[in-house]
Amino acid sequence: MRPYQQEAKDSIFSAWEECDNVLFQMPTGTGKTRLFSSIISDIKAWSTLHSFDCRILIIAHRIELIDQISENLQRYRIPHGIIAGGRERDLRQYVQVASIQTITHHANVDAISELDIRFIIIDEAHHSVANSYRKLWKMFEGAKILGVTATPWRMNGSGFYPLYDRLITSKPIKEFISEGWLSPYNFYSVKSQSLEVQTISNINEFDIEGDYKVSALEKEMDTMQIRARLLDSYLRLAKGKKGIIYSISRKHSEHIREEYKQAGFKVVTIDANTPRDERRLYVQRFKNGLIDIIVNVDIFSEGFDCPDIEFIQLARPTRSLVKYLQQVGRGLRPTEGKTTCIILDNVGSCLKFGLPNEERSWEEFFMGKPEKEQTDHKNYEASFGLGTKEIDYTEGSDELCLVDGVENPPSNPENKTPAWNDADDDLLRVLFVEKGCSINLLASVFKTKEVVIKDILKRKGLFTEC
């Protein structure tokens, strides 16, 4: 466990002593799955010690998230069952990972309610104010509930209280970056007078959640001129780097893919209709460097775990702070050799929501903040010096400008491990306990200081100084 994860866990257990329903905010890329895996292990250890049958339910709303949670639980050797669609169920396991749609379906409610669930963990908990989630509180009355999200925010301004009794927030993104836990970035955006922003401002068709209608976005934003400007900004600012482009729809993805493919790049598209095995193959090939760019439709907004992303390009306008921060957050996972992530905001989202590292009033959003009172950042060009570094487009008079960035990434702080990821915990244990590797050798393997290795081993109960 990283120090901030241990602090978070302690805060959550302390809050549970005073109330039942806790919402925890933690930025994308900072290891929430590792956190709640550790929470599950502690609950299981306590229940075993006290001979108490304590069942735990983990809830997600998409099959991709369920699969990812299951894979992580396997990595941490936590036996579990899955309750999702037509998948085979093993209700004997004390941990169950469930789809919210399946577990609240009327055909399953009676059987599931008999499981005597004592703890519930809700992933991507910004969705949990929906009616389908509220059924959980009725089905498992008296259970301790933990909601985990990077963004406790609702587009309509409705809050999370009193559904949740308390909000616990982690440190802001700016601190995670300065301490080396998240990657620095260079953020480029179009100006408020750009063609893209002016086009978006004229769209007045919205879906049931309040975001732009896909059909309206396709009509206005999927044009040859705007797509050419996407490619142009990539060529000028991120050429040769691998990353993710967020698109509007399948059709928009295909159009973008063709533009980049003709420019000589290895590009694939992924959406909800892409078969799971094919999707995993693409992601693996991306990690191995066989694919340069993945163009996707919302699939990688939630739950995509790949630290190798060197650039993010926003080609899909949104009115959702949740989507915006999740999308840019995918590029902030640190990895060896990665100095910065390049973020290309070709739709001007930062003008509405601010930069990723801005400190936000999560407590206000938790209690409820009307949409009309939510901050709009139209003055970023003045307040952040937009235009100090300008790049002219080959066509038109608009510019993509550096809004925020770092000249020199922060050095590795004392006793920190910036590129450490959750899989390293298992590898460290195997090398130290099973293979008998020395502290000196482990420090060399993990490219860090001996004191860092000792500190991690001490926290895991594997090492004591004589």
Predicted features by range, described:
Residues 331-358:
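Conserved segment of the helicase C-terminal RecA-like domain
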Residues 167-244:
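Conserved interdomain linker/interface between the two RecA-like ATPase lobes of SF2 helicase motors
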Residues 127-187:
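Post-DEXD/H (motif II) to motif III coupling segment of the RecA-like Helicase ATP-binding lobe
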Residues 53-73:
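Conserved Walker A/P-loop ATP-binding site and its immediately adjacent core
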Residues 86-116, 130, 134-135:
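Conserved helix/coil segment N-terminal to the catalytic DExD/H
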Residues 1-23:
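Conserved pre-motif I regulatory segment
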Residues 88-90, 255, 265-297:
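Conserved helicase ATPase core of P-loop NTP-dependent helicases/translocases
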Residues 293-296, 302-317, 323, 340-345:
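A short beta-strand element within the Helicase C-terminal
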